[in-house]
Amino acid sequence: MYSVEDLLISHGYKLSRKLPAPHEDDGERRQPARTTVPAGPGLLNGCDDGPAALPRGKASPGTGLLSDPESRRLGPRGHGERPSTAAAARISEAGFYHQPVLAWSSQPLTGRSHAYWRRREQEAREDPGGRGPVPSLPTHPREGPWEVGGRSEHVMKKAVWEDELGMAGPARWQDVSVRSWNQPPRLGRQMSDGVGEKLFQDLYPFMLGEHGLTSQSKGKSQSLPRVLSPESLSCMEVPIPLSDGHLPGVPKVPLQPPNCASNLESTRNPKKAGTSAPLPQPRFGRPLKPPSYGSQPHSKAGAENGSYTDSRQLDPGAAHSARTNSARQDLYGPDPGLEPPVYVPPPSYKSPPQPAAHPCPEEAVSRHEGRGRRVPQHPMERPAAGGQPLSGSRGAGSEWGASPCSPVGVPPQPHHTTAYDGSILIIPFDDPRIRHIKLPRPHGFWEDVKLDGAVPAPDPRSLQQEGAVWGPSGKERGPAPADPSPSWLWGQPPRNGENGSSPDQRDPCIVTQRKQPDVSGSPQEYPESLVSSPSPQGESSCEMQTQLRKFEAGLQPKRSSKKKTSETIFCLVSIPVKSESQLPGTDTNNNDLKQSASLQEQSVLSLSSTDLELQALTGSMATRTELPRPDPGGPGRGRQADDLRFPSPAKHRALAWPGPWPGHHFRDQQTQTSFAHEPQSLQPLPGERPGGSPDPVLPPRCLDPAPFEVQMHMALASSDPNQRPGAHSPKSQGSLSPSSNSAFSGSSWPRNQGPVPRASLGQQGSDGPGRRASPVSRGEVIKGETTGPCNSRQLFGQFLLKPVSRRPWDLISQLESFNKELQEEEGSSGSSSDGSGSEDSDTELPWGSCARPAPQLPGLLKDIVPEDPRTRPGRVKSKSESWSEEGRPRSPRPWQAEGRGSVWLSPPGSWIAEDGDREVEDRVAQLAVSPRPVKRAISSGLNDAKPEPPPDPAEQREPLPSQELPGSRGAVELSAAGPPRAGGGEQGSTRAPLSLAGKSRGLSAPDLRSVGLTLVQEHSTSQLAGSPGDANAIEIPPNESLEARAARILGIEVAVESLLPGAQRAGQRRHPEPDGSALRPESPRQEAAASLAQPNESTAPADAFYGRRKCGWTKSPLFVGERDSTRQVPRASEPADVDGAVPTKAPETPPSPLESQPFLPKDVETKPPFRSTLFHFIERTPNLAFSEKKLRNTSRVIESLQEKLVSPPRKADPDRLTRMKEVSSVSRMRLLTSRAADSAEEPKAERGPGAWLGGLVAPSAGHKLSDPQGALSLEADGHPAARRENGGRDFWCPDSYDPSRVERV
C-alpha cells in the first residue's frame, strides 16, 4: 500500500512543517516513535500528533503510534493505559493533543467551551503528566490517532473555543479535559481506536488514501504516518473514527460528537465561524492543518479527500473544523503546501476510507457548524470541514459534540449520526467521486441547489438533520422534507446548508450531498424536483443521493468494511449522474429527467426510510432516469442496454420507480441483475426512450467508470452537451448527453454493451443526423439508442449501486475495474465523452467534445452537427451514422452505406472515405485491440479503392482527428495497431469501415474506444500516410496494441487469450472475411467480450456477443447473423479479405494479397458501403422493421444475461469454444454454400455485406461495384443468411455459437 506520505505527496500534499509546540511538546516523548515522521510534518495537520502523540501521549510509544491501530483497535486498552497516564501525561506532553482532543470532543461545547478547553489545553500542554485525568482515560483508549492529531487539533479547537466562547480556559479546560474533553475526543477517537480501529482495519484499504494514513500512522507506516499523521492522521483519524467509529456500532457515540459538534457548532456557528478563521493557531503552536484546506475553496476540500485528509489530520472534532480551519489558517497558514491544490484522492484510497460514517456526519456537522461558522470560513472552513469533514466535521462532531456523553444534544445527533454514519461512511469514498461529479458542472449546479435557499435552513435544520437525517441511515428522507431543498433528505440538509455555504462540495458527509449539489440535479434522486429546480434537469443529483442512500444502505453494512466496499461501488454509481451537466443542454431529456425528478420526489416521499435509503442508493439513479433503474437490467452487462433503449421509458420508469420487480428497487437501479425484466420493459422504449431509456442503457456497464466517466463527462459537459444536446438533445440524448451518454454510454455501456453504444451512437447520430436525415432512422435510433445512452448516463451510478447489492460482487468488481479503466481510458482518450452509444462517440466525445467538438467533420456534422463529439471523427457516425444514417440515407444507399461513417460528407467518396475512415479507424482501433481486429482492419484496408475515397474524408475529417485529441493518440495507436495492417493498411482503412459497421455495432465499448482512438488514428494514419496502406501501416501495431490497446480500449486488462482468440479467429476466419467477418465481429466481439466479459465475466462472452448486439440486438438476426455471418461470410467467402488481412494474419489463403487487395478493395469497398447500408439499415430495422427480432433477440439477450449473471462467468466458454470451432468451419462451409443461396435473402436480413457492397462500392469509386457487390452481396447476403441460419439463430442462444462470444472465448 502507499504510505500515507506517499499518498499525500502523490496527491499533491506537501507534508507540512512540523508542529512546533505541540510536537515539540509531545516530540520529546514522541519523537522516537515519530522519528520517521518529522514532528512538524507529523503534526502538520495536527494529526501526526496522532501518531506521534500516541507514542508521546502513550506511555508506550509503540502502542501510541504504532499501536495507533491497536490503540484504535484496542482503543480502550491502548488508550486505557494512556488515558490517565499516557493520556494525561501525553496530553500534557503533547500539550493539547491527547487531552484537548478528548476534552474538546467530550465537552458538550456548552458551558465549558473555550475557556475550559483552553485551560485544559494549557494544562495538557503544561501538565504533561498531571493533565491526564481519569476522564481522559476513557477517551484515550481511542485517542491514539485522534489524540495525537485530535489533541493538537483540539488544542487548536480549544483556542478557537476559548476565543469563541471566551470560557475560562483553565476551568473549562481542566474540567472538560479531564471529563468531557477526554471522553469526547475519545468518542471521536474512540470510534477511531476501538470500533473505529476495527472498522479502520476493515476499511483500511479503502481508507488507504487518508484512512490508510491513519492506519500507517498507527504504526504501520510509522514514518509516513507520522509525517502524514499530523496532516493525514488527524484528518484521517477523524474520518476513521467516524468511519470506523461511526461505522461500527460503538463509534456511534463519536458520530454523536460530530453531530453534537454540528449542533454545537451550529449553535456556535458564529463563534466557530468567527473563531475558526481566527483560530488561535499559535496558541498551541502546532500547524495542525494548513489553513489551505480550510482556505482552499470548498470545491477542492469538499471534493478532495486531501481536504478530508487534512481535515482528518487537522481536527478530530468539529472544533477542529472551526478551530483547525482558523488554526490552520493561522497555525497552518504557512502550511498550505500540506494540502494539495485540488486533492481529489483516488477513489481507491479515498473512497472507502472516507466512506467512514463520519464524513457525512462530520460533513453534516461541519456543514452545520460551517453553516454559521463555515459560511464565514466558507472557503477555508468548508475545505476544512469538507476537506476535513471526517476529521473536522467528525472531529468537530467528536470534539464539539465531543462525547457520546456530551449532553449537548449530542445523543439524538449521535444516534442519527450513528445511523447516518453508516450511510455517511461511503461519503469519503464519494468525496473523490463527488469531486468528480462536482468538478464537471456541479459547482454551478450544486451551488445553485445550494444557493437555492438551502443555505439558510440547513444551518439549524442541518444540525437537526444531522441528527435526524444523518442520524438515521435513511434519515435523509426525514430531514429532506425539512430541507428547503430536501433533494437529499439527509444529504440535502447539509447540502442546503453547505450548498449555500458551498460546503457541499467538500462535505464528505455530503459527499452525496456534495454530489447532489454538484449535479444540482444531483439530488435528482430524491430532490430531482428539488434539485431540478436549481438545475433544470435535476442533473445527476440522484447520483449524489444515490451515494447518500448508499451511505445509508451501506452505512449499516458499512459497519462491515465489506459492505462498505459495496457501498463504495454504490458511490461510484451515484456519481455518474451527469445529467446535470448535459441535462440543461438537452431539453428532450429534460422532460424525462424532470419526470424522473418528480417521480423521484414522489418516490422519496412515498418510500419508507429504508426504501428511501435504497432509493438514495439506487433510486436516485432511477429517479434521475426512471428508465435507468430498469435499464440496469436492460443494459445489465451491456446487453440489455440496447433493449433498454427500445423499451419505452415510461415502462422503464414504471419498472424503475415502483420497482415493479419485487426486490428490484435496487436491482433496477443496479440494473445489472434484473436484465430480463428491464429489457422487456425497456423494449417498448422506441419512442419514449429519449429521456429515460438511454440512461438505463448505459448504467449496467458503467458501474465503476461512472464516476470517472461522469467526471469526464462533466468536464466534457460543455462539449458533450454540444454533442448531446446537438445530436441527442432533440431526443433523449440530452439525458444521455448530460452524463450518461458521455460517461456511461461512452465508457460504460459502450464497452459494456458494445452494440448498445452502437445503437446509442447510431441513435445519437440518428438522433442528431439520423433524426434529422430520416425520421425512421432517427426514430429508430432515438427510440432505443439515444435515449438509452441518455438515461444510461443518468443510470450509471444507479447500476453501480445495484450491482453492489444485487449482482455478484465479483462481477461488480470486474465491471467496476473494467469500467473504471475503460472510463479512465476512454476519458483519457475522450472515449467516454460520447459514450452515448458509439465507441466513436465514446472515444471521440471526451476528446471530440473537449478537444474538437465543433471542428468535427463539417460534412459529418451537417446532420450530426448536434452530436458534434459523435461527429468528432466522423466515425462517431460510423456507429451513430451507421444507425442514424442508415435509416436516414436509406433511400440513398450510397449515403446509407457511406453515410454510416461518412454519409455526412456530401461527396459519396467523402462519405465512403468518411465512413471508411471512421470504420477503418473503428476497425483499426479494434485491430489494435486484438490481432483479429488488426487483421480485420487490414482486411478492411484491403480495399484500395475504399481507402482512396476515405483519404478525402479522412483528410476532410483529418481536421477532426487533428482536433480530436484522439487524433494524435488515435494515430499513434493506429500506428500501433496499423503495422499488422500495414500491408493492407489502406485496405484496413477501407475494410475497417466494413468491419466497423458490424464491429462498431457489435462492439459498443471496444469499438467506441477503438474508434475514438483508432478512428483518429485511422484518420490520421489515413491522412498522414497518404496511401491507405501507409496509414494502415501506421496504425497496424495491433500486436503491441492487442493487449495494451485492448486494455486501454476496454479499460480493463483483457486476457491475451481473449484477444488472441480474436487473432486465432482472425486467422481462422481471416480467409473468409477476416476483417469484416472475423476481424470486425471478432474484434468487436472480442473487444466487447473482453470489455463486457471482463466487467461481468459471467456475462462476458454473452455480453460481448450481446453487447455487440446491443445495437444488433435490435437487429438480432442482423447483428448475430450479419455480424457473425459477415464475419464468417468473409471468412468462408472472402479469401480476398483474408488476403487483405494476409499482411496482418491471413491464415487462410493469401492468394495474392496484392491481387486480393485490389479485388478486395473493390469487394471491401463495395462491401463496407453495402454492409454499412444494409447492416446498419438492418440494425436500424431491428429497431424499427426488425423490432420484433430485436425484441425477441433482446429478450433472449436479457435472458442470457440474467443467466450469465446467475451462472458462472464462463459456464458456456468451453461450449462456446467448441461451438466456435464447429461453427467456424460449418459457417465457412455454409457461407460458401449459402453465400449465393442466401444472398438475396440475406442482404436485407443481414444488410451488412450487401449494404456495404452497394453503398460503399458505389461511393468508393465503384470498385467493381457490381462484381464486388455481387460477390459481397452473395458473400454478405448469402453468407449472412447462412450465418444467421447457422449462427444467427444460434447466436441468440447464449450458449449457441456466437462469433462474438466465440471471440471472447
From Swiss-Prot:
Compositional bias segments (type: Basic and acidic residues): 21-31, 69-82, 120-129, 140-151, 360-369, 878-889, 945-958, 1276-1288
The entry's keywords: Cell adhesion, Cell junction, Phosphoprotein
GO CC terms in record: adherens junction; ruffle membrane
InterPro entries tied to this protein: JCAD
The protein, known as: Junctional cadherin 5-associated protein
Start and end residues of each stretch annotated as Disordered: 13-86, 120-151, 249-419, 450-545, 575-604, 616-795, 818-1005, 1062-1166, 1234-1305
Biased composition (Pro residues): 337-358
Source organism, top-level taxon: Eukaryota
Intracellular or extracellular location(s): Cell junction, Adherens junction
Main subcellular location: other
Residues with Phosphoserine modification: S841, S1004, S1010, S1152, S1239
GO biological process: cell adhesion; positive regulation of blood vessel endothelial cell proliferation involved in sprouting angiogenesis
Polar residues: compositionally biased ranges: 530-545, 579-594, 669-683
